[in-house]
UniProtKB/Swiss-Prot annotation:
InterPro entries: Papain-like_cys_pep_sf, Peptidase_C19, Peptidase_C19_UCH, USP_CS, USP_dom
Source organism (scientific name): Schizosaccharomyces pombe (strain 972 / ATCC 24843) (Fission yeast)
Protein name listed in UniProt: Probable ubiquitin carboxyl-terminal hydrolase 9
Ranges of Basic and acidic residues composition bias in the record: 553-570
Region ranges (Disordered): 1-23, 85-110, 447-473, 511-530, 540-585
Amino acid sequence: MSLLRWMGMNSPGSTDRRKSTWEAELPKPSIRPETLTDRFYGLTNYGNTCYVSSVLVSLYHLKPFRDSLNSYPLPSAPPNFKSVCTKTNHPESSSSRHSKKKSMENRKSSLYGSNGINSCGCVDISNVGSESGTKHQIVVGESNCSAYGMKENIYTCLKDLYCSVSCCDCRYGICSPERFIQVLRRDNEAFRSTQQQDAHEFFNFLLNSVTETLDEYYGNHSDVMHPKWVHSLFEGTLTSETKCLTCENITSRDESFLDLSIDIENHTSVTSCLRSFSASEMLSSKNKFHCDVCKSLQEAEKRMKIKKLPKILSLHLKRFKYNETQEGHDKLFYTIVFTNEMRLFTTTEDAENAERMYYLSSVIVHVGGGPHRGHYVSIVRTKTYGWVLFDDENVTPVNENYLQRFFGDQPGQATAYVLFYTAADEEDDDVSEVDTKESIKPMSIPSQLKQESVEVSNLSSTPRSNSTITYPDMDPMVASFSSQYSHKTLDRDINSRSYFDREPSLDAERFHSRSVDASPKAVRRESRSFFPSLTRKRSKFFGSSQSNSPKDSPLRDTHKSSDEHSESKHSHTLPWQFSRSRSKR
């Protein structure tokens, strides 16, 4: 039996017969059952809310944070998630359904050919197991705050959002955090604007809101022990040591932190930036230190060290610098190298777990030239599929080398902005065994799939890359296909999507509707006004080869007719990637 026939994509009447969920059609991942708790849900963008999505996705995939949020406080009654987790069916007329079906057939024909294989060797099975016109979507609506004994606030909405995804039977789909966005804008004036906001500022606001809500709740319930799990996970202790150069007395002062904001320099690494963070500072002249032993102002040496290491280390790279001339912030496109493993050496002598090893868990990437424009995406390490890119509704597996594109040394405007490192001794056992303790090596494809995999690779026009990394416990189907996945189209897609967030009055859907109605010349004129940097550089995104030919410009790929745009947008669709389709107006 061929691979395509086994998957039900090349057999007669395969589109008409009733199918079970598409997961049943795939080989089971070669991992233990408890690791199947991963959920891969993209979040709907409600107009420049990608800064929210990137933070929520990153925190959700930090298992200690997600589990603590779902567990505290325990509901007095089982929360009613029926109104929260639903499958949405969009009724359509027969003519509209026929038109969309024909358009989809034309699109798949150009993407996958007659055998269902695209040029990258990826099989399109994103709709396997779903009924016609139906995609799994979670709409988080009415709050279950009464079950938690709280008033509706950011914390209860976040708890509803995470619980609805965790409790959902389907592992893949789209989540619409509508109520969370409404309450966020209701309770905080800074986030009511449709302008792009800073993801790090939102992260700090979210942690503070969660902490304040829990303090208030457990303050009113003195009979229940306050777990203080936010501080338990993120809190560390900094020690400011000041050494008098006259008597050599050392004065120490401790302060807590939930994240570290570090200054950056060009052509350095995160470890080097942390060393600079703890570098010595001379206190002299007008900045002399008052020594309690000398009883006078003395020259002194001051430095910051880490006394207590957090379980989850959040690092904020300070890429935005205030420009007094322009009275605004400029982005620093410095090259900052970060690694999957890191150990901090800027600790005090009496520090707890001074030799603690950290592993990279999530990266929030900013695409754009300033803090209030551009786009945010997140890349997280998962137990099942390794590294996964979350770009609003789009969910795509990527290999480990893909992270190197965000060091800041590539053409384009995408750079790592916030890094989340998890301590090795705090990681879940199955995560440690899969992603950290074992070296990443090519997985062995089961014998019954070897011949079929060879056939798929022969059909592909793109040769298999020898540098592609597959994960030892990745789903065999995804491993065999993602190894041939082209990141160039993904890079260009992120680049083009980021510019939809530059102008608050112009969202992606309105842009597409205007592009369809306009003539090609009008579209190009409008493109130059909204994409000035791309028009000047005419370069591929993330370090692709530059071209001087206008026909190779990303603009030629970005602004097409409706059907052509959909083709380019979904040309890199992987088996379980979901994205919201946009309708014409």
